């Protein structure tokens, strides 16, 4: 049990130094903050998927995956002739 507490203390110290110690916890100033941020981001994505439906959520991800530092996903899709069905982005009523 003491080693678990020691490990959490080390992770907390690293988080306070600005290192990301939990996937999705970027920006937290402590281990607890990292945990909370990661959980909130995960829950937010799940909620969005429920609102849009699996198909719309996947289509939105396709568009986002096309984005670069120079242009948005929509601009790149138009330039390359990739069809993105934005009607699927609508939330379910």
From Swiss-Prot:
Disordered: annotated segments: 1-93
Pfam families xrefs: LEA_5
Ranges of Basic and acidic residues composition bias in the record: 9-19, 31-52, 73-93
GO cellular component, as recorded: cytosol
InterPro entries xref list: LEA_5, Sm_Hydphi_plant_seed_CS, Small_hydrophilic_seed_prot
Highest taxon of the lineage: Eukaryota
GO biological process: response to abscisic acid
Family, similarity comment: Belongs to the small hydrophilic plant seed protein family.
Task performed by this protein: Lea proteins are late embryonic proteins abundant in higher plant seed embryos. It may have a role in desiccation tolerance by acting as an osmoprotective protein or as a desiccation-damage repair protein.
PANTHER family recorded: EM PROTEIN, EM-LIKE PROTEIN GEA1
Name this polypeptide is given: Late embryogenesis abundant protein B19.1B
Native source species: Hordeum vulgare (Barley)
Lineage summary: Eukaryota, Viridiplantae, Streptophyta, Embryophyta, Tracheophyta
């Amino acid at each position: 049990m003491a080693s678990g507490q020691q490990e959490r203390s080390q992770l907390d110290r690293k988080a306070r130094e600005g290192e990301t110690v939990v996937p999705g916890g970027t920006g937290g100033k402590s281990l607890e903050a990292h945990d909370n941020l990661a959980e909130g981001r995960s829950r937010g994505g799940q909620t969005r998927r429920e609102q849009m439906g699996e198909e719309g959520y996947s289509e939105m991800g396709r568009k986002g995956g096309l984005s670069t530092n120079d242009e948005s996903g929509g601009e790149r899709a138009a330039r390359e002739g990739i069809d993105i069905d934005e009607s699927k982005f609508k939330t379910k009523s």
